[in-house]
Amino acid sequence: YVFAKNANVKMPKRYLACQEGLYTNKNNDVVNFDEAVAYISDLGDCFAKPSIGTDSGNGCGVYCLVGGIDKLSGKTCREVLSGLGENFVLQERIKCHESIRKIYAGSVNTFRIMTYRWHDSIVSAPVIMRIGRGGTSWTMPTQVECL
């Protein structure tokens, strides 16, 4: 995240991260659990995902954090954070362009562009489009009344 940010690569805003139980805010400052809870209490629409061992949307979730409560589940921010475990990132929720959502609206569909070095140049492999599918451990809400 830090390298991409410094290289001006467009990425979702990172609100909070946790690695092995160590919380860091958007400025990469270390914060304790209570500070993390207070920090996220009014984020609004956001997305959390595991930072270790994730695949196909497993362990991911959409939240609407307002007034210390997740409006989607009714859980407190303290309960939400406790449930995310010790390795996760909480970030801005992104949405696909309408033309890509038409393919499958239940996930964020992405293009994967792989590059490699060949002799003295950088070459790109054929572009792959990753399309979500049903059956993961969470369902993306289609209508979120957040804030």
Give short role names for the model-derived ranges.
Residues 44, 68-147:
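Phosphate-binding site of ATP-dependent enzymes
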Residues 16-19, 51-53, 93, 118:
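An acidic- and aromatic-residue-enriched active-site/binding cleft used to recognize and process polar
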Residues 45-77:
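Glycine-rich phosphate-binding loop of ATP-grasp-fold ATP-dependent ligases
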Residues 10, 46, 56, 107-109:
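Short, basic and Ser/Thr-rich N-terminal targeting/leader segments
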Residues 40, 52-54, 104-108:
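A short catalytic or substrate-binding loop motif that flags glycine-/basic-rich loops and adjacent residues
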Residues 1-39, 54:
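Conserved N-proximal alpha/beta basic substrate-recognition cap immediately N-terminal to
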Residues 22-27, 57-62, 99-104:
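Short, solvent-exposed polar/charged micro-motifs at secondary-structure junctions
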